[in-house]
């Protein structure tokens, strides 16, 4: 009898036995940590009405419908396989809110269509938390502190933690006067030569030119502060001051890098953003931020902030780290 070779779709991801073991160990540690911090574990449904994603707008943009796995129910309504965890938890908070604040944790997969040639998987395992309804200062410090504690539980040796501001980025785009798309691309790629060419082609003020030319500096805080202060722009200055305050308050836990060129990964981020990286990975291992505007779509007004661990990236980084240690 001929043996049939059943292949996985190229976009699918199948964890190895060691990856599953590592995942469950990390889950156990993080469940314990989240429980100690009073975060309740929730399990959103795998499917949501597509309208949950397409009807919500943030900063004039909608979610990328081309990346959604959509299906038609027998009644004719469109439903979508879970695209992310944040929106379902915003919906949950708005529906069952019985207090001024809520703390949720989650463990599971999200599903997004990806192009084959990019080598990305359409299914990604995430572990994360969301905090709703606390005051801005309290919630931001709580989440940042918890994110740093989570990083310590991952088992990765060399990590860095960066913070940025969506408000700072949005103000830069306003000052760029119609060149938002190009500026965003240059900042995402951290293309210094391209950024210098962009600056020369535009009639920016001397102070803004000075800031943009050195915006990728991350190890000279006083120099960055002077460059921002010289712009005399209230939004840029207040955003930087907030990041500096977070850096100073959390530096006893772990050194914090301020990245003024950080670009929001999700359109709904409104203020603080942060990412963590490992020397054993080429993608962020953790990312998060503030997204207050999303709640207004559910007739709620409250501060909202959260983050997620990108477990597929983390598990591969752990394997690479172990391999490097064995070769030393």
Swiss-Prot record:
Main location: cytoplasm
Keywords: Amino-acid biosynthesis, Cytoplasm, Histidine biosynthesis
GO MF, one example: transferase activity
Subcellular location: Cytoplasm
A family per Pfam: tRNA-synt_His
Pathway assigned in UniProt: Amino-acid biosynthesis; L-histidine biosynthesis; L-histidine from 5-phospho-alpha-D-ribose 1-diphosphate: step 1/9
Entry coiled-coil feature ranges: none
Keyword presence, Amino-acid biosynthesis: yes
InterPro entries cross-referenced by the UniProt entry: aa-tRNA-synth_II (IPR006195), aa-tRNA-synth_II/BPL/LPL (IPR045864), HisRS-like_core (IPR041715), HisRS/HisZ (IPR004516), HisZ (IPR004517)
Cellular component terms (Gene Ontology): cytoplasm
GO biological process: histidyl-tRNA aminoacylation; L-histidine biosynthetic process
Keyword Repeat: no
Protein's job: Required for the first step of histidine biosynthesis. May allow the feedback regulation of ATP phosphoribosyltransferase activity by histidine.
Subunit structure: Heterooctamer composed of four HisG and four HisZ subunits.
The family this protein is said to belong to: Belongs to the class-II aminoacyl-tRNA synthetase family. HisZ subfamily.
Misc. comment: This function is generally fulfilled by the C-terminal part of HisG, which is missing in some bacteria such as this one.
Protein name, entry field: ATP phosphoribosyltransferase regulatory subunit
Gene source species: Lactococcus lactis subsp. lactis (strain IL1403) (Streptococcus lactis)
